Amino acid sequence: TMQLSERGKLDRKTFDRGMGVIISESSRLTSIVEELLDFSRIQSGRMKLIKEKLDILAEFDDAVYFLKERAVTEGKHLLYDEPEVVYPAVYGDKNRLKQVFLNVLDNALKYTPKGGVVAAQVIYSKDEPDIIKIVITDTGCGISAEDLPKVKEKFYKANQTVGGSGIGLAVADEIMNLHNGSLDIESGEGVGTTVT
């Protein structure tokens, strides 16, 4: 890029666009390497959680906010109304939990077409005081009945046309297990997906 720029054959717009692609691809590759390292740590029992008392709602809000602009840029609707209820503090690793939130929201946006909707909500009931549910539903392509049981397996990708390593949900599932939680997925081909 530098040689072309020095010779004056590359206009500013093309240069900026090229740099944008380079930065985007660098981020994507870094993300894949981080997922592989996380999965390796989980498999070898070396993943350490830094558990602390945290506001789970604030962590989820940050994840939604982080992806909101991307949704707008891609012509998708990311819907989330922050609950007005005060939630009890949770004891967990805020960075790892946020990683799960970002992974699931990212997948929902990735597999939802332009004009589609990704809706997120946080559910807490005093009837189940030890459970906080975060539900993310999309109007994307969905997952076939054949593929659904396999989506949390490492390197499994139901849809080969969309980028990614195929280990994000496997890592997210393991992180939730380490927090005594679960990652439940309901889906149907052509009807979207719900992750709780």
What are these regions (language model features)?
Residues 44-49, 89-92:
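Conserved micro-motifs of the catalytic ATP-binding
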Residues 70-81:
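Short conserved segments within the C-terminal catalytic ATPase subdomain
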Residues 143-155:
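Short conserved segment of the HATPase_c
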Residues 50-65, 98:
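A conserved beta-strand-to-alpha-helix junction within the catalytic ATP-binding
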Residues 24-29:
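Short alpha-helical segment of the dimerization/phosphotransfer core of two-component systems
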Residues 108-109:
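Short helix-loop "hinge" at the ATP-lid/N-box region of the Bergerat-fold HATPase_c
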